[in-house]
Structures are given as structure tokens and as C-alpha cells.
């Protein structure tokens, strides 16, 4: 969920500050949630840090996370405070980021393809087999992409879009 460099830095600082030996395991949000669910009766995870909001809210709703009201909560953005309240203080948003798609300009130029500018552009036949997407079952970001499309288009049109996009997907990572 969080970039490896951030995980390494956080782990180093935490270990130095507390003297505790830690083991950081990097996973997608969906995979992390599945592990917490599987370990519900015998938890092996102490801290789940990072990832998209929806799986954290699901974990809170399922009773997989503990209540914690940070003394720094008032310093966070209003959306993060709302997430904490909504979850009964069992999760809190710590960062946000844009959702979009990236492309390889050199590959597009080599194949004489126009730069995709909208989600609809990714449906064009010239992109058949050229699009990669993370698996929403294991990636919180891919899950968030689907949730965003549902919010933008409505559920029926969003899933029609995903069905139309599928032939252009070369790999679900």
C-alpha cells in the first residue's frame, strides 16, 4: 500500500525511537484486509499502515481494528477527521492522492498512438491489449478506481465501462 522507501524510513525511525524490533510486510490494501480477516481469531498483525480508505473502513466495521483517538486528530484535514469519526476512531486517513492513469510517451510515439486523455479514450480499439490494471481484489487503488467510476458514472454505466475496457487489458497485476 505504501511505497517501499516510506516503509523503510518509518520502520527505521520507529525502531530507533522505541528500541523495538519490527518486521514490515508490504501488501496491497485488499490483500492486507484479507489477511486481517483470516487472522481475526489469532491476530499476527500489530499495525496496518497505509492503503486506501475503503478497506480500512471495512476492517473497522468488522471489528478488526482497535479504537485509538490520536491527540493530533484535530491537526488533520477535515476528511481525515470524518473518516476517524465514521469508523468509531478505528481508522484515520493520513494521506490522499490523485487517481488517474499513466502512459508511456515513448511507446505511444513508437506505435503512433494518441495520448489518452479521458477514461473513455482507454476504450478505443487501438489500445487493445495495451492497458494494464491492478486487480481490485488485492489492490486498494484498483478498488478505489472502480468505486470512483461508480460515483462518476453510476453503477450500471461503470460496470458497462469496465466490461468494455476488459478486451484492452493485457494484464491484471
Each language-model region and where it sits:
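Short, well-structured alpha-helical segments in soluble
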Residues: 34-41
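Short, well-ordered alpha-helices that flank and scaffold nucleotide-derived cofactor binding pockets
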Residues: 12, 16, 38, 151
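A short beta-strand-loop structural module common to alpha/beta enzyme folds
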Residues: 21-31
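Short alpha-helix C-terminal cap/hinge motif
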Residues: 9-23
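Extracytoplasmic ligand-binding site segments that recognize negatively charged/polar headgroups
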Residues: 1-8, 29-31, 43-173
Amino acid at each position: 500500500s505504501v511505497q517501499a522507501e516510506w516503509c523503510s524510513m518509518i520502520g527505521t525511525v520507529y525502531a530507533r525511537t522505541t528500541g523495538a524490533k519490527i518486521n514490515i510486510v508490504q501488501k496491497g490494501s485488499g490483500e492486507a484486509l484479507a489477511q486481517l480477516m483470516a487472522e481475526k481469531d489469532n491476530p499476527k498483525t500489530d499495525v496496518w499502515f497505509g492503503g486506501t480508505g475503503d478497506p480500512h473502513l471495512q476492517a473497522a466495521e468488522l471489528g478488526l481494528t482497535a479504537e485509538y483517538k490520536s491527540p493530533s486528530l484535530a491537526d488533520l484535514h477535515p476528511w481525515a477527521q470524518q473518516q476517524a469519526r465514521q469508523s468509531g476512531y478505528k481508522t484515520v486517513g493520513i494521506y490522499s492522492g490523485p487517481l488517474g492513469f499513466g502512459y508511456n510517451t515513448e511507446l505511444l510515439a513508437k506505435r503512433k498512438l494518441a495520448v489518452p486523455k479521458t477514461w473513455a479514450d482507454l476504450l478505443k480499439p487501438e489500445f487493445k491489449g495495451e492497458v494494464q490494471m491492478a486487480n481490485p481484489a488485492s489492490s486498494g487503488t484498483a478498488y478505489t478506481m472502480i468505486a470512483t467510476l461508480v460515483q462518476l458514472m453510476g453503477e450500471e454505466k461503470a460496470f458497462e465501462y469496465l466490461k468494455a475496457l476488459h478486451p484492452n487489458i493485457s494484464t491484471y497485476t
